[in-house]
Amino acid sequence: MITKEDIVADVVTDYPKSADIFRNAGIDFCCGGQESIASAVNHKPNIDLNSLLNKLNHIDNTEGNSTINPKFLNVESLIQYIQSAYHETLKEEFKNLTPYMTKLAKVHGPSHPYLLKLQDLYREFRDSMLDHIRKEDEEDFPKLIQYSQGQDVQNIKIILEDLINDHEDTGQLLNVMNQLTSDYQTPEEACGTWKLVYQRLQNIERQTHQHVHLENHVLFKKVS
């Protein structure tokens, strides 16, 4: 049973579908997930604690029971899971989405200047994430695996702190894009490309929150 004393990030780790409930309540389970549910709700005057707990305790986890629970993977297997589920898919999505983002800004940017700003933010987010993923795959993750196997790795705490700081910067960029688009609500005049871009940006946001949660609150805990 999930209680008000449970830590938000731990709940998402054990019950992945709870991420949607926390997201809808505006509760950060990613970079700010290390607080109790009660404490998180205290910052949200429009959220009823008992109602939230009721929703959390009625999560249907039948689908999750048949899938991998990353919590029980060792460090090397967990890293492989992260790379397959998030790194590779995100790189592919950036490749596919960028032409649509370019088209949207070119066609509708002159009459809707905030779309030009959105394009700049998207490019910044894309480039920083690609660089971050490359660094993790080529430099940081191999060191985490070595450390988990008992090998001597210098400055492991600094490595983790740097990665967490990168994640916080990523979260801030996502928040700015979310605010700029009013939580990806398209206007009435939005064309198909506009709707497509917003939908896929929103999906990237959700996937990135889950991605960062898995690294910050599961992987890094295993090696800290």
Curated annotation (Swiss-Prot):
Under InterPro entries, the record lists: Hemerythrin-like, RIC_family, ScdA, ScdA-like_N_sf
Annotated Gene Ontology MF terms? metal ion binding
Which GO cellular component terms are attached?
A: cytoplasm
Listed A to Z, the keywords are: Cytoplasm, Iron, Metal-binding, Stress response
Pfam families in the cross-refs: Hemerythrin, ScdA_N
Q: What does the UniProt entry say about where the protein is found?
A: Cytoplasm
**Record family assignment:** Belongs to the RIC family. ScdA subfamily.
What this chain does, per the record? Di-iron-containing protein involved in the repair of iron-sulfur clusters damaged by oxidative and nitrosative stress conditions.
Quaternary structure and partners: Homodimer.
User: What protein is this chain from?
Assistant: Iron-sulfur cluster repair protein ScdA
- Name the source organism: Staphylococcus epidermidis (strain ATCC 35984 / DSM 28319 / BCRC 17069 / CCUG 31568 / BM 3577 / RP62A)
